[in-house]
């Protein structure tokens, strides 16, 4: 049985754990320094004016702290927060109920906002710009629109795929902030802090080892820490040492660069089955037995960041670094790798 620890979504138990270790003030939020510095200025200015903060769009790979920052924004504004997700807002009435229940200055947090149905999304336009919504009553010849005023509020939207947002929705966010992957040093500090909350010590070398294999993602670092805690408790060890951390990571088959079994399967497929690419996302998903959306949203961003995959108009291609590591034939490194122009997001 394959254990996919790195890339699985947060479950209920993990969500409760994240709530326990979640910082509640901007000064306690580790990383994303420029982003948080700017937000502090915007929040302070809004409070000085007595206005609601401009609507905020938080984008970036999963597990980097978008939900945490949404709660911090509400806390810094001294406001309440209502949280939901795009897939749950399947009817306009669900959104209308949330909007009409907001008090002045409240924060409405919509996770996975790119998955909100277009018909529901359109209700947000007037709510975000004019703080009103138009509700249709009855149907057919007797149908009529009723305009409801709502209190000024701040919408915080989180997305892992900002490119899927419609232009009208994206244009209504006054603050657009993108999350970057974390450095190993920052992850090490996050691990040490979380270990104190878990009630088990971790030495510096162990924290560094876990941080180095966490793919630049705090959520993954915390998952690995919890698994290392399990190994330490079974071994009746009062402290997570480097030896225990190494045993944990080896048993979970997570290598020095944080790649797990599925990452390696994806790379092996591109390099050896498709001769380095290009290969389309749909073909790749079928070959590895994974959903296309999961490939694009969960696995691919880190593989691109790590320099193993490049995206082109004709599909994914393996880089020379990938060929050197994953090719079963040394001669594979001689093939043309970048015949096609890179997409815009690869130039950044």
From Swiss-Prot:
Query: Where would you find the membrane-spanning parts of this chain?
Result: none
The answer to whether the entry has keyword Hydrolase is: yes
Question: GO annotations under biological process?
Answer: DNA recombination; DNA repair
Which reaction is the catalytic activity of this chain?
A: ATP + H2O = ADP + phosphate + H(+)
Residues the record lists as binding DNA: 311, 316
Q: Does the keyword Nucleotide-binding apply?
A: yes
What domain of life?
Bacteria
Q: Report the subcellular localization.
A: Cytoplasm
Tell me which residues bind Mg(2+): 67
Q: Which GO terms describe its cellular component?
A: cytoplasm; Holliday junction resolvase complex
Where this protein primarily resides, as one coarse class? cytoplasm
Q: Where does ATP bind?
A: 21-22, 63, 66-68, 129-131, 172, 182, 219
Arranged from A to Z, the UniProt key words for this protein are: ATP-binding, Cytoplasm, DNA damage, DNA recombination, DNA repair, DNA-binding, Hydrolase, Nucleotide-binding
Q: What is its EC number?
A: 3.6.4.-
In its UniProt record, a GO molecular function of this protein is: four-way junction DNA binding
Which family is it part of?
Belongs to the RuvB family.
This chain's protein is named Holliday junction branch migration complex subunit RuvB
The organism encoding this protein is Chlorobium limicola (strain DSM 245 / NBRC 103803 / 6330)
